């Protein structure tokens, strides 16, 4: 029997998922410091890595804005479908959502260092309240918290990385929960839409179930556990992936976070 020995650490890969939301403003600097340390560690040990920032603002990167619309406008994003086709009862993913690949082990060292500098200067522009001495990308503002959408997308990112390696670890860096998830509904079934687009959404609550179309397994959902159930669903399909989520909070924020979590645990959703 032939045995192939793979050097420890050479068959692992890391995917970092960074929260690019407005509430990260006060802690983005320290978060980037830790992220850069992890990236340098991966480079030193030759571990493949990808870093993505999740946002609902950078949809503007791949489209030109109308002259009569400000670049901050979210108009017409509902038509920017990020899935093959709109389906009723699917989890809704807004057209403005994007996963931006900001760092990659595939890039040259010189390019990675340049991009780190760009990210650091972008952080400085937020830290100093958009001071003109630190310009920032006009189409890459801090935004909302589409964490659930990001988790859904990690499945495809993991599958892509697993083509060359055996185990993938997903590291999530965020300061809080995702914004309230929703699912697609056909509004024409409930009332006359008067010629308007019949595609609508409803908030996910305790009456909803998440169904894995591949395995048929279902997962009970509430307002507060959607992120955990999405991760569980991915791990059931891809057992060689692990998730590590860090809740990043600023000094003195532990009490607020604990109170918020307790409120969701006792609220009858």
PLM regions: where:
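Acidic, glycine-rich A-domain
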Residues: 1-268
């Amino acid at each position: 029997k032939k045995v192939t020995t793979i050097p420890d650490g050479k068959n692992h890969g890391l995917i970092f998922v960074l929260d690019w939301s407005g509430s990260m403003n006060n802690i983005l600097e320290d978060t980037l410091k830790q992220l850069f340390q992890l990236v340098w560690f991966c480079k030193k040990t030759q571990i493949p890595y990808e870093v993505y920032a999740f946002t609902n603002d950078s949809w503007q990167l791949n489209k030109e804005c109308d002259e009569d619309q400000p670049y901050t406008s979210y108009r017409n994003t509902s038509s920017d479908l990020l899935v093959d086709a709109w389906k009723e009862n699917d989890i809704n993913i807004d057209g403005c959502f994007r996963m931006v690949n900001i760092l990659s082990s595939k890039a040259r060292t010189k390019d990675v260092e340049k991009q780190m500098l760009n990210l650091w200067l972008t952080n400085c522009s937020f830290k100093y309240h958009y001071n003109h001495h630190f310009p920032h990308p006009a189409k890459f503002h801090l935004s909302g918290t589409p964490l659930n959408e990001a988790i859904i997308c990690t499945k495809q990112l993991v599958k892509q990385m697993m083509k060359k390696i055996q185990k993938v670890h997903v590291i999530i860096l965020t300061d809080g929960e995702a914004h309230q998830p929703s699912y697609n509904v056909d509004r024409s079934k409930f009332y006359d839409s008067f010629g308007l687009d019949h595609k609508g959404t409803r908030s996910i609550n305790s009456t909803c179930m998440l169904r894995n179309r591949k395995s048929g397994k279902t997962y009970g959902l509430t307002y507060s556990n959607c992120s955990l159930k999405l991760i569980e669903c991915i791990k059931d399909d891809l057992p060689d992936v692990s998730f590590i989520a860090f809740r990043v909070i600023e000094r003195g924020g532990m009490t607020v976070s604990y109170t918020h979590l307790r409120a969701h645990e006792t609220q009858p959703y």
